[in-house]
């Protein structure tokens, strides 16, 4: 599968889940912080790509990068799913896809 296909599928699932819980704006803010962390801290991506690092450690790193350790339950559960499915190497692309999806859906709502 292509990175874009996988990322978009997960991003749509996160958007639907956050929308169902009414937390899409909170998750959007956390996603923005996480996307910025990926850009500023290349070691974050390297850590996620490390197969020796346990999933629990990766979860803590991601939560710290997304909001100082305090993130919404929705984002945390999403990241747990990504780690469980061993798709963490696509997480940066999933987050960017989520931001784009929410941004374009908000823009469409304004029309």
Segments (PLM) and residue ranges:
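Elongated, mostly alpha-helical coiled-coil "stalk/stator" tethers of large membrane protein machines
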Residues: 1-105
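A short, hydrophobic C-terminal helix/tail in secreted or cell-surface proteins
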Residues: 106-111
């Amino acid at each position: 599968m292509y990175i874009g296909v996988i990322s978009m599928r997960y991003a749509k699932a996160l958007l639907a889940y956050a929308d169902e819980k009414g937390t899409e704006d909170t998750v959007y803010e956390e996603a923005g912080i996480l996307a910025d962390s990926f850009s500023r801290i290349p070691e974050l991506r390297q850590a996620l790509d490390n197969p020796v690092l346990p999933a629990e450690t990766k979860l803590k790193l991601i939560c710290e990068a997304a909001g100082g350790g305090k993130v919404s339950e929705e984002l945390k559960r999403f990241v747990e799913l990504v780690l469980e499915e061993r798709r963490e190497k696509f997480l940066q692309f999933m987050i960017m896809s989520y931001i784009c999806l929410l941004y374009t859906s908000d823009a469409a709502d304004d029309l």
